Curated annotation (Swiss-Prot):
Membrane topology: Peripheral membrane protein
Assembly and interaction partners: NDH is composed of at least 16 different subunits, 5 of which are encoded in the nucleus.
PANTHER family reported for this sequence: NADH DEHYDROGENASE [UBIQUINONE] IRON-SULFUR PROTEIN 2, MITOCHONDRIAL, NADH-UBIQUINONE OXIDOREDUCTASE 49 KDA SUBUNIT
Gene Ontology CC: one annotated term: chloroplast thylakoid membrane
HAMAP family linked to this entry: NDH1_NuoD
Residue stretches in coiled coil: none
Protein name: NAD(P)H-quinone oxidoreductase subunit H, chloroplastic
Gene3D superfamilies registered for this protein in UniProt: Cytochrome-c3 Hydrogenase, chain B (1.10.645.10)
The family this protein is said to belong to: Belongs to the complex I 49 kDa subunit family.
Amino acid sequence: MLQTKTDPMVISMGPHHPSMHGVLRLIVTLDGENVIDCEPVLGYLHRAMEKIAENRTIVQYLPYVTRWDYLATMFTEAITVNAPEKLANIEVPKRASYIRVIMLELSRIASHLLWLGPFMADIGAQTPFFYILREREMIYDLFEAATGMRMMHNYFRIGGVASDLPYGWVDKCLDFSDYFLPKVDEYERLITNNPIFLKRVRDVGFISREEAINWGLSGPMLRASGVQWDLRKVDNYECYGELDWNVQWQSDGDCLARYLVRLGEMRESTKIIQQALKAIPGGPYENLEARRLSKGRKSEWNNFEYQFVGKKPSPTFKIPKQEHYVRVEAPKGELGVFLMGDDNVFPWRWKIRSPGFINVQILPELVRGMKLADIMTILGSIDIIMGEVDR
C-alpha cells in the first residue's frame, strides 16, 4: 500500500487580497485544504493616531478621527467630543442630542450595508453588492445635505453639532426610512433561506457565550453568541432612553447568527430614526457655553512661527486634570476612548479602544480545523476595518 506524507504548507494571504477588507495579512498553515494554524499580521495601516492626538487640541484632532473607521465616521466623531464633554460637564441641548442619534443610526445602517455586500461577495453572491450600494447612496445624499460631506463629515462639535438640519431634510429622511424598511425584507427574502448561503455560514465560526465574554468581544459578535449587551441600553447615552427599540441578539454564535443580528439592527436603527425625526424638539443645536475658550499661544508679529508655521492657534478650552473612559456602541462593537487631561489644551493620553482590534484576536481560534474557503466567511462575519485596527 502506497503511503504519502505531506508537509504542512505555509501561505500568505494578503495584504492585497480582495477579501482581506483592507491591508490585513494572514500567514496560514495548511494541511491540504484544512487550516492548521493562522497568524494575523497587523500594522500596515498604522498612522500613530494616538500620538497625533497628544499634539493636537480636540478641535484640531476632529478631522483625523474620521480616518479610524472610515465607513462609520459619525461614531468616531461622537466619541471624540463625548470625552471632553464628560470631563468638563458640558450639557448637550436636546435638539443636538436628537440630531446626533439620527446621524449615528444612519451611519450604522450605512456601515452594515457595506458589510453585507462584500460579505455576500466573499461567499460568492455578487448581486446584493449592487443593491446595498443603491441604498447606501441615499444615506450619503442625506449626509451631504446636512454636513456638506459624503464620508468624512466633521459634523460633531463639543456641546452639539456644527450646523442645524437644513430645510426639508427631516421629510427627506422620513421618506428614506419608509423606503428602506421593505428593502431589508427584500434582502432577507433574497439571502436568508438560500441553500448555498446556509451551507456556507451555518455552524461555521462558532463562538460560545463564555468564549465571547472571555475574549472581550463586543457588538454583533457578542450579541450573536447570546449576550444581550448593547451600550445604547446599558449606558443610555444621548437620548436613546427616550425611544422605543429592542436589542437584537441570537443564541447560535455562528456566522449565520452574526448576519441575522446585523440585519435586525438595520431594522431597529430605521425605527429609532423614525421616532427621533417625529419627536425632534426645537431649540439650539449647540451649547454656546462650550465656547469657553482659553486661547493658545499667540505668535509674535513676524517671528519664526508667523513666517514659517503660518497658522493661528485654534480656539479651544483646557482639558481638566482628570481621567475618563467614554464608550459608544459602534456598528462593529464597543468603541471607547480613555482620556487623561493635564490642565492643558492637549490631552496627556488618548487611548483608543477600537472594536475591530479586539474582535480580530479570536480569528486564529475560529479558523483552526476549518477549510481554507471558510477563512473568508469567518473573517467577513467579524467585520473589521483596518483603519481602526491599526490606527
